[in-house]
Amino acid sequence: MMAAKFFLHGVPDSPAIWGPLLAALNLGDAPVAVPAMPGFTGPLPAGFAATKEAYADWAVTEVERLAAAYGPVDLVGHDWGAIIVQRVAMIRPDLVRSWALSNAVIDPDYRGHRVARIWNTPLLGEIFMAISGPATLAKSLTDQGVPADIAAE
């Protein structure tokens, strides 16, 4: 059996972003986990801190479940999910067979793209999200080439 796979989406995505890639990969009977990060497809769970470390801890728990059943896991992360995947690989290398990243800039001088800087600004990020709404975010994603059905997710 092929190693288990763990795909982690970015911001403002959902697990739907992986659909076309998974179809193209034709992974057969390989166990595949494509979870939604807490708060991304529904309300943030009560008490969840929504910090990098909280998301990394959550991801470790998810990967531990896969590794317990299938052995070391192949991790794939995009954008914010890539940052979390890297953190999982750093703190729990015993769970990881391989890891691959997309759209993650790891450079101490990189400040993030314009929208990421807005999201990271207290109060401004919340206002931006309240004003933007799902339709505006979906349009932004389709303008960047994401299929409309996935962007609407």
Regions from the language model: what does each represent?
Residues 2-3, 71:
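Exposed regions on extracellular, virion, or secretory-pathway luminal proteins
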Residues 3-10:
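Short beta-strand element of the alpha/beta-hydrolase
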Residues 11-17, 25, 33, 38-76, ...:
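Flexible "cap/lid" subdomain of the alpha/beta-hydrolase fold that forms the substrate-access gate
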